[in-house]
């Protein structure tokens, strides 16, 4: 069933709005995936807060025009599914990477972050980025480490004194 002009405009505006607020985008070729597998991918995308959509390439080119993902326009060829990360820059990459491990027919074509077009090989690097919460906890651990070491050092002085006095006591008791 062909789309009329109003439907096309609605799709373009919806994808453009999502692309304008997204942190990263991944385009993957889904040729050979069954309907069940695509439904499974969509369900996982909803759980990860990733916007996933199959859009005609001409409409996708119009939708990403004027956004950070305009660099993807030339590469939008073939049957592609677009995944946009809403909260976490690595969410779409993790979703596609994990799904592609199980389903070899899902092939990554384009990866884009912050207006830069990355190769399909960069998907692994983007997917391994920590989430916001993980990054904050790593930063806090790094900031807390010197304080912990300082506290242990201060605690060591009285501990060493106690061990020395105990050793002298044991030595005197042994000689007596």
Swiss-Prot record:
GO terms for biological process: translation. The keyword Lipoprotein does not apply. GO terms for molecular function: large ribosomal subunit rRNA binding; structural constituent of ribosome. SUPFAM superfamilies: Ribosomal protein L10-like (SSF160369). The keyword Glycoprotein does not apply. GO terms for cellular component: large ribosomal subunit. It comes from the Bacteria. Keywords: Ribonucleoprotein, Ribosomal protein, RNA-binding, rRNA-binding. InterPro entries: Ribosomal_uL10, Ribosomal_uL10-like_sf, Ribosomal_uL10_bac, Ribosomal_uL10_bac_type, Ribosomal_uL10_CS_bac. HAMAP family: Ribosomal_uL10. Belongs to the universal ribosomal protein uL10 family. Forms part of the ribosomal stalk, playing a central role in the interaction of the ribosome with GTP-bound translation factors. Part of the ribosomal stalk of the 50S ribosomal subunit. The N-terminus interacts with L11 and the large rRNA to form the base of the stalk. The C-terminus forms an elongated spine to which L12 dimers bind in a sequential fashion forming a multimeric L10(L12)X complex. NCBIfam families: PRK00099.1-1. This is Large ribosomal subunit protein uL10. It comes from Thioalkalivibrio sulfidiphilus (strain HL-EbGR7).
């Amino acid at each position: 069933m062909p789309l009329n002009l109003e439907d096309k405009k609605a799709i373009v505006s919806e994808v453009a709005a999502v692309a304008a607020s997204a942190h990263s985008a991944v385009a993957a070729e889904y040729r050979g995936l069954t309907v069940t597998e695509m439904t499974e991918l969509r369900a996982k995308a909803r759980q990860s807060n990733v916007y996933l959509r199959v859009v005609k390439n001409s409409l996708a080119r119009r939708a990403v025009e004027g956004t950070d993902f305009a660099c993807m326009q030339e590469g939008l060829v073939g049957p592609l599914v677009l995944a946009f990360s809403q909260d976490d820059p690595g969410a779409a990459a993790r979703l596609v990477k994990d799904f592609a491990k199980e389903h070899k027919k899902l092939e990554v074509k384009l990866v884009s972050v912050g207006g830069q077009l990355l190769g399909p090989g960069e998907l692994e690097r983007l997917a391994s980025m920590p989430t916001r919460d993980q990054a904050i906890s790593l930063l806090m651990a790094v900031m807390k480490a010197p304080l912990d070491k300082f506290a242990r050092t201060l605690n060591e002085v009285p501990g060493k004194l106690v061990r020395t006095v105990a050793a002298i006591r044991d030595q005197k008791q042994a000689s007596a």
